[in-house]
C-alpha cells in the first residue's frame, strides 16, 4: 500500500532553459516550468550555490585555481627541473589526469580535483579551491550545505563520482523501499556531452530524449510507492555554441612584464583573472586585454551584483569577461576551444538554468541559490 511523501530533485548539469523549451523536455509530465538565473561563473561556483543557497562570496567557492603561493599544494614542483617535465609527455591529458589522481590521493583531497592545462612552472604560485567533498556534511563548513540540512532524515544524495546511469539506478532502488523522504539525484554527464555536441541538433535531441525517458521512469517509480510525490528537475546553467576564440596568452606574452613577478593571470575558458604583485602593471594589462575585443572588464559593482566580490580578492583583483560564445584558446583549462561553453553573463539567454516540476512551490525560484531553500523547507 502506498504511503508517505517523498521530495525528489533531479539535478542535470547544463540543462539550460533554452534547451528545455526548444525540445519541450519533460513537457508532458512536468507542467510547472520557469527559467532560473544562473550563478555567474562555472559549476565550481554554481554547484556550491545550489547546495548552500549562498553566493560564492559567502560559501567561498568560485573557480578551481587562485593565486596563493603560501598555501599552494604544488610548491614541490619548484624543485623539479623543466627537463624532467617535457611538454611532449606531461602536457598530455591522460598523463595530467593520472598525476591529478596521485596528487589528490597524496593530500587526501575528497573533492573534484584536476590539473587541467595549467603550465607546470605556474602551479607553485597557485592554490586549489575544491579540496573537500561538497556533497557530504561539513563539505562547505562553516556554511551549512544540503547534506547538513538533511542529516538525520531518510535521504539520498547521489555520489557525484558515479555515472548518471548508476545514480538513476541507485535512486530508483531507494524509492522502491517506500521509506525515502528526500532525494538529490546528481547527473553530471550531460554537461560534457553538450560541450562537445551543442552544435549538432540531432545528437542533442537524442540525448535529451534519453534523459527525459529516465526522468519519466523515475517519477513513475516514485508514484508507485508514495502517496505524495514532489518532483523537480533543476540545473545550474545552459550551454552556448562557440562563436570565436581569443588568444589572451599570446597578447600577454608580448608585454615587457613577468608572470609571477609584476602580474599573475589565470585564463579560464571565458574569463581572465588577474592579480598584481606590482600594481604598476595594472594599466598595461587592462589596456592589452581591452584591445583584444570580444569582452570587457567587470566593474566592482558588477562583481558585487554577481556575488563574487570577495573582500580579499581571492579569485582575482580584476576580471576580464568574454562575450557569449567567445573562448580563450589556449587557456589554462585547455589547449583548444570546445564547441560549447558556459560561464558568460548570467543575463545571457544561453546561460539560464531551469526549474521543471510536477508541483507548484510556495515560491518559484528566481536564482539557482533558491533551489537550496526549496529542498530544505519543511
Where are these regions (language model features)?
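Metal-dependent active-site segment of extracytoplasmic phospho-/sulfohydrolases and closely related
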Residues: 7-12, 17, 210-250, 375
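Short, solvent-exposed turn/loop segments enriched in Gly/Ser/Thr/Pro and often Arg
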Residues: 33-54, 63
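Short catalytic/ligand-binding loop motif for oxyanion handling, primarily in non-cytosolic enzymes
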Residues: 17-20, 58-60, 72, 192-195, ...
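Structural motif
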Residues: 9-11, 182-186, 232-233, 319, ...
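Acidic/histidine-rich catalytic neighborhood
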Residues: 228, 237-277
Amino acid at each position: 500500500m502506498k504511503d508517505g511523501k517523498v521530495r525528489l530533485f533531479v539535478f542535470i548539469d547544463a540543462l539550460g532553459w533554452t534547451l528545455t523549451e526548444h525540445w519541450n523536455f519533460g513537457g508532458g509530465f512536468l507542467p510547472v516550468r520557469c527559467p532560473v538565473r544562473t550563478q555567474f561563473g562555472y559549476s565550481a561556483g554554481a554547484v556550491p550555490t545550489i547546495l548552500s543557497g549562498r553566493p560564492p562570496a559567502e560559501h567561498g567557492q568560485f573557480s578551481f585555481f587562485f593565486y596563493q603561493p603560501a598555501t599552494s599544494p604544488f610548491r614541490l614542483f619548484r624543485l623539479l627541473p623543466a627537463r624532467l617535465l617535457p611538454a611532449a609527455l606531461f602536457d598530455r591529458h591522460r598523463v595530467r589526469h593520472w598525476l591529478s589522481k596521485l596528487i589528490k590521493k597524496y593530500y587526501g583531497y575528497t573533492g573534484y580535483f584536476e590539473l587541467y592545462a595549467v603550465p607546470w612552472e605556474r602551479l607553485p604560485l597557485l592554490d586549489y579551491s575544491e579540496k573537500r567533498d561538497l556533497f557530504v556534511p561539513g563539505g562547505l563548513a562553516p556554511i551549512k550545505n544540503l547534506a547538513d540540512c538533511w542529516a538525520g532524515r531518510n535521504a539520498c544524495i547521489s555520489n557525484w563520482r558515479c555515472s548518471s546511469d548508476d545514480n538513476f539506478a541507485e535512486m530508483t532502488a531507494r524509492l522502491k523501499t517506500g521509506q525515502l523522504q528526500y532525494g538529490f539525484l546528481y547527473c553530471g554527464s550531460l554537461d560534457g556531452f553538450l560541450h562537445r555536441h551543442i552544435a549538432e541538433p540531432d545528437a542533442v535531441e537524442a540525448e535529451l530524449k534519453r534523459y527525459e525517458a529516465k526522468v519519466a521512469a523515475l517519477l513513475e517509480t516514485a508514484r508507485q510507492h508514495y502517496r505524495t510525490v514532489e518532483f523537480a528537475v533543476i540545473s545550474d546553467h545552459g550551454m552556448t555554441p562557440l562563436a570565436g576564440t581569443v588568444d589572451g596568452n599570446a597578447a600577454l606574452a608580448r608585454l615587457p612584464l613577468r608572470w609571477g613577478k609584476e602580474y599573475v593571470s589565470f585564463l579560464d575558458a571565458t574569463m581572465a583573472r588577474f592579480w598584481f604583485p606590482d600594481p604598476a602593471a595594472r594599466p598595461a594589462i587592462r589596456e592589452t586585454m581591452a584591445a583584444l575585443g570580444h569582452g570587457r572588464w567587470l566593474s566592482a559593482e558588477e562583481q558585487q551584483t554577481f556575488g563574487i566580490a570577495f573582500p580579499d580578492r581571492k579569485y582575482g583583483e580584476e576580471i576580464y569577461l568574454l562575450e557569449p560564445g567567445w573562448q580563450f584558446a589556449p587557456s589554462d583549462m585547455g589547449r583548444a576551444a570546445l564547441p560549447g561553453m558556459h560561464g558568460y553573463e548570467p543575463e545571457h539567454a544561453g546561460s539560464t538554468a531551469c526549474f521543471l516540476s510536477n508541483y507548484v512551490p510556495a515560491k518559484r525560484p528566481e536564482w539557482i541559490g533558491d533551489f537550496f531553500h526549496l529542498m530544505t523547507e519543511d
